[in-house]
Amino acid sequence: MPKKFTTRKGDIYTIDTPNEENLFKSVINKNTSEAFRYISQFNFPLSDNIKTIRYFAIDEDKPNNVGTSHSTLSLIAVINNDLETLNLLINFGFDINNHSGINYITPLGLAADKGYKEIVKLLCEQDDIKVQNALYYAIRGENKSIEIIDLLVQKGAIIKPEHIELAISHSNLSVFEYLFEKKLPDIEKNNLKLIGSSPAISSIDCILGEASKYQNTEVIKFLLSSGYKPEQKYIDEFFVSAADNGRLKTCITLKANIEEHTRLEGLSKYQNYLKDKYHDYYKTHIIFLSKFSYTDEPVEMFMFDNESNLLLLSMSRPLRSKLSSKDSYIIHDAIKEIFNNTHLNIKELELARFKARIEFIKITTDEDLVPLSNKLAPLFSPELIHDLSKLEEELFPEVKLAGLAD
């Protein structure tokens, strides 16, 4: 019966022999000299059972799931970012390629995900290293590194269409540009077909569709300014689709490349989206949504009639310049919070936004501050400002048109 061993982090592993337990402890505690001593106690040459030894985590609350999470010694060394111990294990022939754990990740994959460049270099120097699995983690990882991705590609990792999509969905322009350049021959020949793409659509149009879906505005701008600009009909199609699904950042980025009739079609789609999305609040709440302007001029892409009771504020540079810098950041952050957390109660988010603003005003003495409705008055219609003023008074009676009460 294997012995149970609990680490300092609370993880429980099964250990077969005392020497295996000691080796495991030395590796997990980053003690290379002790690891060397315990490895030396095995019979040489090391058997495959020793080289590929795995330590299985136990979930005591779910005993039937024993063995679903497991780690090789090499993976443990990578988890610790322990280059010295990993090098020792490699020199003794311990496995560096086996997938470990429920995430099906290799030591190289984990190192690529974490951005451990020196460990990636060491592993890539090994003749028998398998690199394909690691490319996925390098692209989507916590610390994306072009250097690591290039090491893997130079070692033989094949860039596939799904890697392009992964770079788009994880919003990293530099990684996308690297992969785009590497796959340019396929893109030019329309051989790069993303998952679910139609054979009738070119590679560049497929990429724009993915960027539009994930609202990756940097990639969209890159494509529109490149020598491989997508067809106009697809630019229009993706604009309307984005409006239909409430993807404002995509709409803003594509707006300069569409005709007025397409914009109006998008407006209709977007109004219907808001009615469906905010049905419970449509008649009773004002919803603030950021339009993320990317130009020096206010973006008036979508406007609503007064009956809709929906207020769409454009957080463009001119608007921000008319507000105090700190105040505008509070507003902008709150707007993004609402935009990204639409499953939450809109009323509660509005309360939080005004509370944040009031707390800011209370501790600020270096400028003349007035209620938000007053600051916005020069920029919007009287009817719109009236609605905003009413909301301020409803939520916080201490907010008056002349300023905050003491």
Curated annotation (Swiss-Prot):
PROSITE patterns: ANK_REP_REGION
ANK repeat placement: 68-98, 103-129, 130-161, 163-189, 203-232
Taxonomic superkingdom: Bacteria
Keywords, in A-Z order: ANK repeat, Repeat
InterPro entries associated with the record: Ankyrin_rpt (IPR002110), Ankyrin_rpt-contain_sf (IPR036770), Multifunctional_ANK_Repeat (IPR051165)
Protein known as: Putative ankyrin repeat protein RF_0266
Organism for this UniProt entry: Rickettsia felis (strain ATCC VR-1525 / URRWXCal2) (Rickettsia azadi)
